[in-house]
């Protein structure tokens, strides 16, 4: 898959209609629908979005919890039911993001993304073990993101991507986040994430900038 399909443009879903327009204007071939921004029933928003989005080709559906840096404050038990419903409602080929706690509490998933957002990086061995468990539980990709200022923290993220053979993505948050995302992309990560130019998020580089710099590196076509 080209870089455009591996760079997901984040779309905060505050209003389903506006989110659909943002998604359709994504500068990359992948969008992430952040349903934790939605004030109502996330399933209702997803149903509406599913009828309107015939492009981009790749869509990630996310209900990020407050414990992982998002806005959703449902208890894990309630989240499990909501995520299962989102997976049922999602069109074929769309990926639902399961935080690792949700995935472990469920009976697995069908091609989801297993994500983890710790405050400190796990050891590379622990990260690889967690990725392996996620794969056994049905995930098609593993995502590990954490704050990182020191060079070794960014190197640890890159090592996971390199050793996971296209199954894992990992990058750091903070001053070096753009370089960390580019490194993950260059090493074959299945996904990295950037903000929409019309809906910027604090601390998240724009997906169009990630794409531009990746192509400038001369590593491949979009």
Curated annotation (Swiss-Prot):
Involved in the third step of the chorismate pathway, which leads to the biosynthesis of aromatic amino acids. Catalyzes the cis-dehydration of 3-dehydroquinate (DHQ) and introduces the first double bond of the aromatic ring to yield 3-dehydroshikimate. The keyword rRNA-binding does not apply. InterPro entries: Aldolase_TIM, DHquinase_I. This is 3-dehydroquinate dehydratase. Belongs to the type-I 3-dehydroquinase family. One of its GO terms (biological process) is chorismate biosynthetic process. Keywords: Amino-acid biosynthesis, Aromatic amino acid biosynthesis, Lyase, Schiff base. The gene is aroD. Homodimer. Pathway: Metabolic intermediate biosynthesis; chorismate biosynthesis; chorismate from D-erythrose 4-phosphate and phosphoenolpyruvate: step 3/7. It catalyses: 3-dehydroquinate = 3-dehydroshikimate + H2O. The active site is at 117 (proton donor/acceptor), 143 (schiff-base intermediate with substrate). It is an enzyme of class 4 (lyase). Its EC number is 4.2.1.10.
């Amino acid at each position: 898959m080209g870089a455009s399909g591996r760079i997901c443009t984040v779309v905060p879903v505050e209003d389903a209609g506006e989110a659909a327009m943002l998604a359709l204007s994504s500068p990359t071939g992948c969008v992430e629908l952040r349903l934790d921004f939605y004030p109502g029933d996330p399933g209702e928003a997803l149903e509406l979005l599913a009828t309107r989005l015939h492009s981009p080709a790749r869509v990630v559906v996310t209900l990020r919890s407050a414990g992982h840096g998002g806005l959703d404050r449902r208890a894990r038990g309630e989240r499990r039911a909501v995520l299962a419903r989102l997976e049922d409602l999602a069109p074929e080929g769309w990926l639902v993001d399961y935080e690792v706690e949700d995935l472990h509490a469920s009976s697995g998933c069908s091609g989801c993304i297993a994500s983890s957002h710790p405050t400190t990086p796990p050891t590379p061995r622990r990260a690889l073990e967690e990725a392996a468990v996620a794969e056994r539980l049905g995930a098609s990709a593993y995502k590990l993101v954490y704050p990182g200022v020191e060079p070794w923290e960014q190197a640890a993220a890159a090592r996971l991507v390199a050793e996971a053979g296209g199954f894992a993505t990992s990058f750091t948050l903070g001053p070096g986040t753009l370089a960390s995302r580019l490194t993950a992309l260059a090493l074959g990560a299945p996904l990295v994430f950037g903000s929409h130019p019309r809906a910027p998020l604090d601390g998240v580089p724009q997906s169009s900038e990630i794409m531009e710099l990746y192509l400038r590196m001369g590593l491949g076509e979009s």
